[in-house]
Design a protein with these regions (language model features):
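Conserved acidic donor-binding segment of nucleotide-sugar-dependent glycosyltransferases
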Residues: 343-344, 348-355, 364-370
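Conserved donor-binding/catalytic core segment of Leloir-type glycosyltransferases
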Residues: 220-236, 241-245, 257
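N-terminal subdomain of nucleotide-sugar transferases
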Residues: 1-63, 250, 408-411
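Short hydrophobic beta-strand element within catalytic cores of glycosyltransferases
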Residues: 300-303, 321-332
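A short, well-ordered alpha-helix in the C-terminal region of glycosyltransferases
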Residues: 357, 364, 371-386, 395
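Carbohydrate-associated surface elements
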Residues: 41, 178, 199
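Nucleotide-activated donor-binding/catalytic signature segment of Leloir-type glycosyltransferases, i.e.
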Residues: 259, 265-293
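A short helix/loop element that forms part of the nucleotide-sugar donor recognition site in Leloir-type
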Residues: 50-58, 206-219
Length: 411
């Protein structure tokens, strides 16, 4: 069985970002299947080229996975219009790359950005193969709610494209139970939808590690370290974290660590400087393989999003990493991910945007280390049982088997 995936933001463990698709692909390859991934030659988080090649398409091999890197116009930290240009450049060149992959049995697209899903649909039509569409975020709803997409004509076109792809897909895969409900509400038959939620490989994280090397490097010895790991964009509500840090400026034992990059990073660093925050450190993005050590150096972790109704539907990847690392989550996101944290007993929920409540939660955990550790242990146990990436890879293989009619099982 040969799976072809078109995914502009695909990340390997050597890059920052989520590695869901790498982990699924690796386990398929280990089981004797073939996987080709058409990806951008730009990291979506850093904007750096991931290949040294100068052509439009560069071939790599990663743990037996064939990765075809397609040239993408750079648009990091630029306007929405330039980002559309970047998406369109990948959409066009990815089709050419996909047609170089040889015979395939299934074509998979993933959204957002929705344009790469168009590429996957077109390749599936040309190859006369089933088309599996993965919905990772509800686009364009998120873009509309954030205020990034405002033009009525573009919104109408986006809605039409969304409906077109839902109809044309052989099957739909979602990573949050709320997305399944959303699609059913859009008229997609329930039997056409499969749920494989975001999750984590627990073996990547050692809950007993304490990250002594990084604590020394970042001068965090003796501190209660509260880490946010992820994008620094408009949606992520980092200003709430900075306001909480401002409230805790006199709590010398508490330090906030912001790990990541994004369009708002420069503005956020300027804001922290203007506030005179000496209890906040920005360390930039880190490759996935380094995140175990980063989280080991942390005592508690943060997940924040703006208080927008659509964000109540999402399962943020970072939360599952926090759980597997055995660290409690201070969660300023309502909805389905709150249900996970509360079911696990793995953290504290605070209302989105409420910096006072966030600061109170930090103090609560810093002053009761036994409670904090117990929450982290409960979080890891829950993630291992319910969100184990190895079990999810087996579910993914079974889904492919149903769609293709070929054995694609993983151990």
């Amino acid at each position: 069985m040969h799976l072809l995936l078109i995914h502009q933001a695909f990340a390997s463990p050597n890059e920052p970002g989520g590695t869901r698709h790498y982990e699924f692909a690796r386990q398929l390859v280990q089981a004797g299947q073939r996987v080709t991934i058409v990806a951008s030659d730009l990291s979506y988080l850093t904007g750096q080229r991931t290949t040294a090649g100068r052509g439009l398409i560069t071939r790599q091999e990663l743990d037996g996975i064939v990765v075809l890197r397609a040239y993408t116009y750079p648009a990091l930290h630029r306007s929405f219009a330039w980002r559309i240009v970047s998406f369109l450049s990948f959409m066009v060149i990815s089709v050419g790359a996909a047609l170089r992959a040889g015979p395939v049995d299934l074509v998979m697209g993933t959204s957002p950005p929705i344009f790469q899903a168009v590429s996957a649909w077109l390749v599936a039509v040309l190859r006369r193969r089933p088309f599996l569409l993965e919905v990772r975020d509800l686009w364009p709803d998120f873009a509309i709610d954030i205020g990034v997409l405002r033009n009525p004509v573009l919104i109408a076109l986006s809605r039409w494209l969304e409906r077109f792809l839902y109809r044309r897909a052989t099957h739909l895969l979602v990573n949050s139970p709320a997305y399944r409900d959303y699609l059913i509400g859009k008229g997609v038959p329930q039997e056409k939808i499969s749920l494989i939620p975001n999750g984590v490989d627990p073996e990547m994280f050692d809950p007993e590690a304490r990250g002594e090397r990084l604590r020394a490097e970042w001068r965090l010895d003796g501190k209660f370290v509260v880490t946010y790991a992820g994008a620094l964009g408009l949606a992520n509500d980092i200003p709430t974290i900075l306001r909480a840090a401002d409230r805790l400026r006199d709590q010398s034992e508490v330090h906030f660590l912001l790990v990541g990059d994004g369009k708002e990073r420069a503005n956020l660093e300027a804001q922290a400087h203007q506030l005179g925050l000496t209890n906040v450190t920005f360390v930039g993005s880190r490759p996935k393989f380094e995140m175990a050590e980063v989280l080991a150096a942390s005592d508690a972790c943060l997940a924040t999003l703006r208080d927008i109704p659509m964000f109540r539907t999402t399962y943020p990847n970072k939360v599952f990493d926090y759980m597997a690392a055995g660290r409690p989550t201070i969660l300023a996101i309502d909805g389905v991910i709150r249900q996970v944290i509360e079911a696990a007993g793995g953290g504290i929920f605070v209302p989105p945007g409420d910096d006072a409540a966030l600061a109170t939660a930090v103090i609560s955990l810093s002053q009761d280390r036994a409670r904090s550790r117990a929450m982290g242990q409960a979080a890891r146990a829950y993630a291992v049982e319910h969100f184990n990436r190895r079990q999810q890879a087996a579910q993914f293989a079974e889904l492919i088997e149903r769609l293709v009619g070929t054995k694609a099982r993983v151990a």
